[in-house]
Design a protein with these regions (language model features):
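Membrane transport/envelope proteins' first extracytoplasmic loop
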Residues: 1-241, 245, 250
């Protein structure tokens, strides 16, 4: 019976683990998750062109990302990601409303769990503060994002106190672009492409998927479930073997 239980546990856990991994990879692919997050003092056109010119780089996009306080009740902050142009990399998955037009200076997209926690809906106002100045936004859409599967302020995910919003660069022109996100061509190796990027941008901090916090945590959770497919069946077989040995020794 224990051997049968072990076989059943392996089949069930293996099927679930494969489904989780396939779902995660499909989600990343369909929403064009970045392979690299490149942080530098200024993500100007020259830096963007240097990365785009690399033979193993497929797409690039300049943006900025920073934590800002809001005017919401309580000590609430958001990670504000500012895109220069269309959001072609790390494309948000729309839950409600509509995506931003590239020239929309007052619209924003809000992360779903944060919106639910704070009771935010389409058309509501959300105001962030930068250098003593307030920037009011109208919520155009409720979204989830492949790069924010795990939303955290560095310690723990808490949608009551922390979330993310997406806006266009024209919405906060005072915020300098300091990040480039990039995808690599099919069939290339991450380490090799990262070395190419670092060679043309020696002052940049280059992070790949294995070091990106949310992506790494999501992959670690999937890997942990895959490891469970081996542990529990082995335990069942080990207990069964122990029972047989004990019985025979008598």
């Amino acid at each position: 019976a224990l051997c049968a239980l072990g076989t059943f546990a392996f089949s069930a856990l293996d099927g679930t683990a494969r489904m989780i991994r396939t779902t995660l990879n499909t989600y990343y692919e369909e929403n064009n998750l970045a392979d690299f997050w490149i942080t530098l003092p200024t993500a100007n056109r020259s830096a963007l062109e240097k990365v785009a010119a690399l033979p193993d780089v497929k797409e690039v996009c300049a943006r900025a990302s920073t934590d800002l306080d809001t005017t919401l009740p309580g000590d609430v902050s958001v990670s504000v990601t500012v895109y220069d142009g269309e959001m072609t990399i790390n494309k948000p998955l729309l839950r409600e409303g509509e995506l931003l037009e590239a020239n929309d200076p007052r619209g924003c997209l809000v992360e779903e769990r944060f919106a639910q926690s704070k009771g935010l809906s389409l058309g509501d106002r959300l105001t962030v503060k930068l250098n003593g100045q307030q920037y009011p936004f109208t919520i155009r859409g409720i979204v989830v994002s492949p790069e924010y599967i795990v939303v955290t302020d560095g310690m723990a995910a808490n949608p009551d106190q922390y979330g993310f919003i997406l806006v266009n660069s024209c919405a906060i022109p005072e915020l300098p672009l300091t990040q480039i996100v990039a995808t690599m061509a099919d069939g290339t190796q991450s380490d090799a492409v990262q070395a190419e990027i670092e060679s043309v941008l020696p002052d940049a901090l280059v992070v790949d998927r294995t070091a990106h916090m949310s992506t790494a945590r999501a992959n670690n959770d999937a890997q942990m479930f895959e490891n469970m497919t081996l542990i529990f069946p082995v335990l069942a077989y080990a207990v069964a073997a122990l029972i047989v040995m004990t019985t025979l020794s008598r």
